[in-house]
Amino acid sequence: MPLHHLTRFPRLELIGAPTPLEYLPRLSDYLGREIYIKRDDVTPIAMGGNKLRKLEFLVADALREGADTLITAGAIQSNHVRQTAAVAAKLGLHCVALLENPIGTTAENYLTNGNRLLLDLFNTQIEMCDALTDPDAQLQTLATRIEAQGFRPYVIPVGGSSALGAMGYVESALEIAQQCAEVVGLSSVVVASGSAGTHAGLAVGLEHLMPDVELIGVTVSRSVAEQKPRVISLQQAIAGQLALTATADIHLWDDYFAPGYGVPNDAGMEAVKLLASLEGVLLDPVYTGKAMAGLIDGISQKRFNDDGPILFIHTGGAPALFAYHPHV
């Protein structure tokens, strides 16, 4: 078993059973390709999402260290911050969130609805900053201040994207391999690539479990030149902790995130509408809408290795739909 070292890491069970892997018949007919979806949007806490996989490992480590406070950072509409705050509430921990307004909007819906509304319901302590220019350093400064107030803080990086957090997506690769066995021979997997932990964890896991499968990361905030070193750095760190080699190339498409992180675009919103109308599946304007736009265009432009089945990783994010309506 190539990933047996995964069991060495403490893990807090937050998700339970594997998330569904489903065939999308109407989208498949529409695109002329077999399309499957991994439903990490339906994880069980606080409207779901992929970050719970990372939090299973990160919060287990926080509890092991005796922390009573989780500190993390992200955009006002961060799905990661929302899920971290929910887990903190569930466990009776304090949560401090350092937030930025990356799109500089004054739209009330963006500033108060969606994920931001949920943070208030989870009784999260909100700290605003002008910009997360150096989030690791900014989080450490905040942790020092919180510690001076008598708390025992544990810092969770942006997106939960550390080598430890990314173990959650090595675990996801195991689920995918087991769910696909004798059911479907995948050719490609498509995932949104942002803080890079989800992408890197899948890269390590799939390289060892499904080495013939092409993994495509659709960037949501950076060019390939900016994003690839981030994914590779985490890929190598994960592999090192699992005593594995990781030699698979990292494939990224950066044609679909303009005009920038957190700013909806036409192709992404069309993808949101398409999945909702054809399959009753809700994507979001920031991550999965843009990643699905990449999948759709990738088929049209023949960018995939072959014409075989494609799996789309649904990382969640639907609460942001309410924050982005009608526009920002």
Swiss-Prot record:
Q: Which reaction does it catalyse?
A: D-cysteine + H2O = hydrogen sulfide + pyruvate + NH4(+) + H(+)
- Cite a single GO BP annotation: D-amino acid metabolic process
InterPro entries, per the entry = ACCD_DCysDesulf (IPR027278), D-Cys_desShydrase (IPR005966), D_Cys_desulphydr_bac (IPR023702), TrpB-like_PALP (IPR001926), TrpB-like_PALP_sf (IPR036052)
Tell me the enzyme class: lyase
For this UniProt entry, the molecular function terms from Gene Ontology, in alphabetical order, are: D-cysteine desulfhydrase activity
Task: Give the record's keywords alphabetically.
Answer: Lyase, Pyridoxal phosphate
According to the lineage, what is the superkingdom? Bacteria
Cofactor(s) needed by this chain:
pyridoxal 5'-phosphate
Q: EC no.?
A: 4.4.1.15
Q: Which residues carry this modification: N6-(pyridoxal phosphate)lysine?
A: 51
Q: Name one Pfam family in it.
A: PALP
Give the record's family classification: Belongs to the ACC deaminase/D-cysteine desulfhydrase family.
| HAMAP family named among the record's database cross-references | D_Cys_desulfhydr
- According to its UniProt entry, what is the function of this protein? Catalyzes the alpha,beta-elimination reaction of D-cysteine and of several D-cysteine derivatives. It could be a defense mechanism against D-cysteine.
What NCBIfam families has UniProt attached to this entry?
ACC_deam_rel (TIGR01275), PRK03910.1-1 (NF003029), PRK03910.1-3 (NF003030), PRK03910.1-5 (NF003032)
Outline the subunit composition: Homodimer.
Task: Spell out the protein name for this chain.
Answer: D-cysteine desulfhydrase
Native organism is Salmonella choleraesuis (strain SC-B67)
Lineage summary: Bacteria, Pseudomonadati, Pseudomonadota, Gammaproteobacteria, Enterobacterales
